Regions:
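Small-residue-enriched core segments of transmembrane alpha-helices in multipass membrane transport
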Residues: 130-135
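Helix-coil boundary and N-terminal low-complexity module in membrane systems
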Residues: 1-112, 122-128, 139-142, 147-224
Length: 224
């Protein structure tokens, strides 16, 4: 009995170790694919003059986030992180590059608006509105990508389902933004962990949070 218990504990700890390794690999690949953006965001001040170059360097974020989500979703059955990441990245670029251009354009427009309105006290309402729209866009994007990974649909169908879930399962859907921000704030206290696990850990936590929503949709599909 004690031997079985020991083996179970060893298996349990090994699975944790596997996830640490997988998250590290996925995070390094994510940083590699977004290296120009990561470098620029650290060396450039965010101001109107730098927004175009930040925009151009950030269009890789959405396809690479898709690749991380897709890779982590099937990691227990397909643990070859590097191979799977690049397969899914190629698919992500085919499906999402044009959409990424649009999403990132609106994101940086909002950032620019926030920069301008922050300096004009008479436009404080617009300042907070742009912050709100920015939060909505980021939350919608991560949820959209998780939905896309879980069901084969067109871009339009994926967007519609994501919007419906944001209404029906609003708490879970909106919680993902807090998870993203909270993860980076906590890991920022330990920069080495932020570098090693930041993006992949935040994405994994968003996927875990969204799992009940996925189960809900799957039940609806089975009952239909």
């Amino acid at each position: 009995m004690k031997k079985d218990e020991l083996l179970y504990k060893l298996y349990h700890y090994t699975s944790y170790l596997n996830y640490i390794i997988w998250l590290f690999e996925a995070n390094m690949l994510f940083l590699l694919m977004n290296f120009p953006f990561v470098v620029l965001i650290f060396i450039l001040d965010i101001r109107l003059g730098t927004l175009p170059i930040l925009y151009l360097s950030s269009v890789t974020l959405i396809p690479s986030t898709y690749a991380v989500i897709k890779t982590l979703k099937n990691v227990e059955t397909e643990p070859k992180i590097i191979k799977n990441f690049f397969v899914h990245l190629k698919m992500g670029y085919k499906r999402l590059f044009k959409l990424s251009l649009v999403f990132m354009f609106f994101l940086w427009i909002m950032v620019g608006n926030i920069f301008i309105t922050a300096q004009l006290p008479s436009l404080q309402i617009l300042f907070w509105l742009n912050i709100l729209f920015l939060l909505v866009l980021i939350t919608f994007t991560i949820n959209f990508l998780i939905v896309m990974v879980n069901w084969k649909q067109t871009i339009k169908e994926t967007a519609i389902l994501t919007i419906k879930l944001a209404i029906v399962k609003s708490i879970r859907s909106n919680l993902n933004f807090l998870i993203l921000i909270g993860t980076f704030i906590l890991l920022k206290l330990f920069p080495i962990y932020l570098l090693m696990f930041g993006a992949s850990l935040a994405i994994l936590l968003c996927m875990i949070n969204f799992k009940p929503v996925i189960d809900f949709v799957n039940r609806q599909i089975e009952e239909a």
